[in-house]
Amino acid sequence: MAESNNRMVVSLEDLLAQADALRKEIDALQKLRDEIAESLNAARSAKEAINLIKGQGKDLLLSADRRGFVLLKVTEIPSSKVLVNLGLGYYAEIEPDQASKILDEREEQLNKSLQDITARLNNAVNAYTQIAEILNRAQQQQGE
């Protein structure tokens, strides 16, 4: 690389390598963002389930899977204690209000992580776009 008059000269190979690295980073960040969003939705669903159990009538329909392909009809679920995932495979049997607080904290952490990942993703996409524009201009100049 050479620098003169505030202009930097970079080889096309370096730009292509940088674009490839950014593309891989973008793919990884998108995957991570999707996983965090899925975890966030799961935490929200868990909170909704706790609220549903607390206010249940006689019968309750619970989804046996994530998509609701199988529903279970349940009667009279004891609502004094629930099991909540503490992470790393550990669960605690606690009162629903405590579980809701834990889920609120988890939701807050996931929202913060989602914002951080989204910001990193936007930066990577902007950098990739700039490199792509430079490569397009270089290709047009070579064609002339």
From Swiss-Prot:
Chief site of localization: cytoplasm
InterPro entries named among the record's database cross-references: PFD_alpha_archaea, Prefoldin, Prefoldin_subunit_alpha
Domain of life the protein comes from: Archaea
GO terms classed as biological process: protein folding
GO terms assigned for molecular function: unfolded protein binding
Location in or out of the cell: Cytoplasm
GO cellular component: cytoplasm; prefoldin complex
Stored CDD domains: Prefoldin_alpha (cd00584)
Alphabetic keyword roster: Chaperone, Cytoplasm
UniProt-listed HAMAP family: PfdA
Oligomeric and partner information: Heterohexamer of two alpha and four beta subunits.
Function summary: Molecular chaperone capable of stabilizing a range of proteins. Seems to fulfill an ATP-independent, HSP70-like function in archaeal de novo protein folding.
Similarity remark: Belongs to the prefoldin alpha subunit family.
Protein name in the entry: Prefoldin subunit alpha
Species for this entry: Metallosphaera sedula (strain ATCC 51363 / DSM 5348 / JCM 9185 / NBRC 15509 / TH2)
Protein encoded by which gene: pfdA
